[in-house]
Amino acid sequence: MKRQRAFTIIELLVVLAIIAVLIGLLFPAIGAVKRNARQTENNTLVRGVLQSMVTYSAGHRNFFPGFDGFAFDDNTADTTGASAHGQTPEGRYWVMLTENYTTGDALISPSEDKTPWQRDAVIKDNYSFAMLNLATNPTVVTPPINDGNAYRREEWRNQQNPQVPLVTDRLVDNSEYIDGDTTTYLSIHDGSEVGKWLGSIGFGDLSVEFSNTSEVETRFSGYRNDADDIFTPGDGTGTGQEPFKNAEITYSVVNQPNG
């Protein structure tokens, strides 16, 4: 009968070293899987917001919540403050929530810890996603060529434009944030670092992509921008690590017809 040989210390150390290497390889892979799952879920939520907007538009002359083609919806003023109306994301989300086009849970990214809306006013803590910046009421007359707001308002309706971002992740400020300076940008997602924005971008045709840049090609109202920073000029004021900064998307208008 052969006597069984026990592991030597050296052999045991070799086995432990192999296990450590395998763990070192496995953990990043697990992290990547989790990160990809969150990104996929985030894309799904952004697409859900777009689909809710399209459903709303079917009964409102193809316009999305908050703007009817002539003026902003002021029915939201009772709950969001007189300055809000339908021009802010809060006002537009309020319309969608109170008229049951979406739910509070559907507005919060898996990468954020926020409070789902229950009742009354919609506040910054109730949503994760930016909406197209419609700015001031169009009753304030501005020559169209100088009014980027007019071009964006023209796109706030269901016309299946695949190059018009309508709903995206927000731009989050950091303590060194400089308005409109992409080198200071930050986002809520894992892998983001100062100067590297990551996030879901939802377009007018209901397509959604998870992008590692805030610069995309846009075509809207007869104009094209091949590298349009959707957060320029910046939409937030001041600095500081506030999780609701830049909750509106802004296009840069360039005198470059579609081609």
Task: Identify the function of each model-found stretch.
Residues K2-T44:
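Amphipathic alpha-helical segments typified by the pilin-like N-terminal helix
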